[in-house]
């Protein structure tokens, strides 16, 4: 029996991409309840249908949540515990991309203030608000194995003279995760981070708006030495970190796919 079987999980950004792949794998391994938060509701029905085909006994609860809103995040997580009585694990996957290759040197002078705030609001503040609220509700539950996984990026290891907001948000996400991990480990809560490389998700074309097709994007990255992974590859690492199989790993930042440059 899987160590996530019969347990309750929360997944931000869970309606598509890596988040949806994580939900499907949790269902495949017997999770009792998966609570999905996403600002985009259009994929909720298809996600629920796909999970029903994988495991009809897994309950999927989808909620529209803007992770950059403290109120949205707090209400969602408190609602999970109020309704289901527990929360064993959470994956904070919600995030947005930033287009590369649109700026000319000096690229820093073309970094837009509004885009900077928007990217950091979702990719960094959203992770902070979610992790803080998850720790708060988990702390008040009976002592048990509990795990939180945040999703950063290979950009956390990179020094690219472009996409400053995205790289900063992901580097800060990884740093934040390791600090929180050291803080809460003694409360029985493990916190870890996953940093995907180039991953085939709906966000991928948004990073390379000048490239017309997915095949061309894959070729571009392959020529730079970066193979393309699938969302399911990342999901396997997230679910492992959520499970008791990964005890006592905490404060880790695991790259999935391309290695750090």
UniProtKB/Swiss-Prot annotation:
Residues 1-20 form the signal peptide. The keyword RNA-binding does not apply. Its EC number is 1.1.1.332. It is an enzyme of class 1 (oxidoreductase). The active site is at 166 (proton donor), 170 (lowers pka of active site tyr). GO terms for biological process: indole alkaloid biosynthetic process. InterPro entries: NAD(P)-bd_dom_sf (IPR036291), SDR_fam (IPR002347). Pfam families: adh_short_C2. It catalyses: chanoclavine-I + NAD(+) = chanoclavine-I aldehyde + NADH + H(+). NADP(+) binds at residues 18, 66, 132, 166, 170, 201. One of its GO terms (molecular function) is oxidoreductase activity. Pathway: Alkaloid biosynthesis; ergot alkaloid biosynthesis. Keywords: Alkaloid metabolism, Glycoprotein, NADP, Oxidoreductase, Signal. It comes from the Eukaryota. Glycans are attached at residues 40, 55. Belongs to the short-chain dehydrogenases/reductases (SDR) family. Homotetramer. Chanoclavine-I dehydrogenase; part of the gene cluster that mediates the biosynthesis of fungal ergot alkaloid. DmaW catalyzes the first step of ergot alkaloid biosynthesis by condensing dimethylallyl diphosphate (DMAP) and tryptophan to form 4-dimethylallyl-L-tryptophan. The second step is catalyzed by the methyltransferase easF that methylates 4-dimethylallyl-L-tryptophan in the presence of S-adenosyl-L-methionine, resulting in the formation of 4-dimethylallyl-L-abrine. This is Chanoclavine-I dehydrogenase easD. It comes from Claviceps fusiformis.
